[in-house]
């Protein structure tokens, strides 16, 4: 009987080994690159001023301090505007990859105007460059949006000053015929939130981005994980089985 159980145990181990899904983190040198024109403070484009100054129209806006930091400057007399900022380099589908491929970045949020400011807004996500759709997590609404005008509310989550949010993209191996689509997932303070989102067929290139209002962020694109590791342990990421 003990010998029989031992054989069953050996078989289970072998099956688990066969089902093992190897995953590689794809390191891409990245930085914040551009503020989308529609979301600039005014026609004078004060958001690119160096050194930082207030908007001549009194509007609030986002300013690219350096490669990783976006500082939101509160308005004086005008409106605090939403700012949309994209990273320079996209997450592109790997070619001839025998493993699952993981792309990932994180941002640390700093509230401007006080922790109780009702104007604070932050979205983190990826823009599908093939079909111009946005897949993102809204920390303000505690909701995940799938790019198809559908959202999924995560009612138990809160949004606090100094929270760290992450967005990941996983591509299957090139020869994985039955797993056609990549998926996207989100994290908060080192833990996955919600389920994954399967993407569309036309999904070869994604660009990291954020929407901000009254909220500054510091990004970690994984440029140097030895000195600045992610809060989320990417080495322990398991291929998701549950999706919206």
Region locations from a protein language model:
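PRY/SPRY (B30.2) beta-sandwich protein-interaction domains
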Residues: 1-244
């Amino acid at each position: 009987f003990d010998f029989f159980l031992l054989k069953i145990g050996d078989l289970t181990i072998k099956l688990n080994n066969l089902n093992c899904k190897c995953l590689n983190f794809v390191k891409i040198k990245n930085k914040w690159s551009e503020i989308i024109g529609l979301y600039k403070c005014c026609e004078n484009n004060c958001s690119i001023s160096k050194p930082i100054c207030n908007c001549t129209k009194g509007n609030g806006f986002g300013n690219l301090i350096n490669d990783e930091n976006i500082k939101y400057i509160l308005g004086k007399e005008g409106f605090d505007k939403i700012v949309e900022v994209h990273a320079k380099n996209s997450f592109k589908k790997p070619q001839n990859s025998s493993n699952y491929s993981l792309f990932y970045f994180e941002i640390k949020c700093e509230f401007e105007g006080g922790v109780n400011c009702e104007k604070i807004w932050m979205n983190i996500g990826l823009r599908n460059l093939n079909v111009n759709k946005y897949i993102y997590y809204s920390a303000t609404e505690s909701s995940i949006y799938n790019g198809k005008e559908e959202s999924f509310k995560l009612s138990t989550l809160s949004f606090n000053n100094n929270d760290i949010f992450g967005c990941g993209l996983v591509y299957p191996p090139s020869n994985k015929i039955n797993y056609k689509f990549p998926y996207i997932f989100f994290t908060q303070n080192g833990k996955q939130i919600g389920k994954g989102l399967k993407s569309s067929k036309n999904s070869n290139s994604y660009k990291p981005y954020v929407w901000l209002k009254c909220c500054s962020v510091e990004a970690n694109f994984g440029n140097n994980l030895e000195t600045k590791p992610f809060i989320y342990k990417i080495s322990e990421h398991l291929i998701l089985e549950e999706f919206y």
